[in-house]
Swiss-Prot record:
Protein's job: Involved in mRNA degradation. Hydrolyzes single-stranded polyribonucleotides processively in the 3' to 5' direction.
Family statement: Belongs to the RNR ribonuclease family. RNase II subfamily.
Protein name as catalogued: Exoribonuclease 2
GO cellular component, one term: cytosol
Domain called S1 motif: residue spans: 561-643
Protein's UniProt keywords contain Cytoplasm: yes
Cysteines engaged in disulfide bonds, as pairs: none
Intracellular or extracellular location(s): Cytoplasm
Amino acid sequence: MLQDNPLLAQLKQQLHSQTPRAEGVVKATEKGFGFLEVDAQKSYFIPPPQMKKVMHGDRVTAVIHTQKDRETAEPEELIEPFLTRFVGKVHKKDDRLSIVPDHPLLKDAIPCRADRNCEHDFKEGDWAVAQMRRHPLKGDRGFYADLTHFITYSDDHFVPWWVTLARHNLEKEAPNGVATEMLDEGLERRDLTALNFVTIDSASTQDMDDALYVEEGADGKLHLTVAIADPTAWIAEGSKLDDSAKVRAFTNYLPGFNIPMLPRELSDDLCSLRPNQIRPVLACRMTIAADGTIEDDIEFFAATIESKAKLAYDDVSNWLEGAGNWKPESEAIAQQITLLQRVCLSRGEWRKTHALVFKDRPDYRFVLGEKGEVLDIVAEPRRIANRIVEESMIAANICAARVLRDKLGFGIYNVHTGFDPANTEALAALLKTHDVHVDPQEVLTLEGFCKLRRELDAQPSGFLDSRIRRFQSYAEISTEPGPHFGLGLEAYATWTSPIRKYGDMVNHRLLKAIVKGETIARPQDEATVQMAERRRLNRMAERDVGDWLYARFLSDKAGTDTRFAAEIIDISRGGMRVRLVENGAVAFIPAPFLHAVRDELVCSQENGSVQIKGETVYKVTDVIDVNIAEVRMETRSIIARPVV
């Protein structure tokens, strides 16, 4: 009788509209309760029974109840689920399947079944890709998922790689396809096979995409020719291979192996600038003045070359530093190395004065056994040979940026605008507290940004530099020429790695059109969106595999007295993140490990410091000694504590 009563319906509606509600993101804890985080300042407690309706990371609206001055949230409507497609570990009990998502804050098993299109017979411990199908806030009784893909068995030694690639939905192997013959591009190729081109790479590199040759003019100026592998001589625009490269966008470099953008036959053989093999190239010749300036007579052209030597970074560096037994196999190669060093030093000086030079950080290389076990992690400092290649590539990319801008007005550019305009007042205020004075408008110009960077680089520590990082904008990929503040350059367009970057292949096609005097269409903006997204995913995959391998490598150090020097890289309310100097692993030091009395401890992300009883004890960029307290394999996290 009452159910159709309009007055009752109206009353219900009124009550509903008067009940306070909030929208936010669910944050789970390990103790069963959770919080609805509305913004940085406001959060509501979610009791354990209500947490059963939601999952960590869900965006929901909730009814806010007030009892005895305590506010609690009752999740009511799902706005955006945290889990849609995910990876996890399968459990099997009495022929019933469930899956535990591979996420540090998701511990509960979700009932599931194998999807119709997935024919694998799932066993306990298998890794799988799953798709959420049911959610309590959608009116379902509980959570439920379908297993859509089998990833691998629990005892596979390469679980870190396969699970990570599946998580980010990235390819596991090289693309299929062959290129049987070179295209007729109507390009005249200069025969440079007699010149002493050399490649300098890691000893294990197979996909050599750059070769260098220098000669000195009578006036003492250096003429550098950068020859770059030419995959677009084999791959037609719009072909199957081109489409697959466009999707992959980059070769994916993971610890231990890579997944190439192009078929290996091309990347490691036909296009690779192997020694004593004749190869087609796209080349750039530039004149470098005594002070390192690149003069205006930049020339791009097609050619064939024959690399005369595959040199390794360490050998070249040792020889130039007068160490080790290696020496160049001929006087001609020795002369090339010496001239390349001159190019490097003069260009490095020019960039220091007129642009910006990144601080050298070592690369960390995982040494793996046949079963994926980590035998060692080696810090490889950037030495003179690395800098020779880096300076040559940066010079070549500056040339491409200029030529594309002046001849076409477009290309694939790396653009970085420095600071976000919305942040410059706060930036100036922060710097002022450290006696560094900047004009909020001036730092938005390339010149003003470079001036500030040089001032920060001259500081005794990197502390202030680390404080202003949060005000910086991100680098972008754009079809429009624009400045790259991070490098201190007016424009920057890469073309020197076309075997491993699709954007460089696009720039090759544009440069070839200029060489031939033809018109060509501007690249589509969607292509740059795909490149940026793939770059992000590849970086996350590299980090995820690295975290897994670091956890494996350091697990036997947990609870021991082994000391590691560690640089503080971040401070938050909960503690500090540090990077171990000798191997690059990132570890977390919880606040209770810093000081036992919580009220006497202030961990400030804002100030980048930890204070105990009002005294600053730690700050970002400090290097401290730590022990490994614990390694949690299921979350691949390393917990450290300071050595007292």
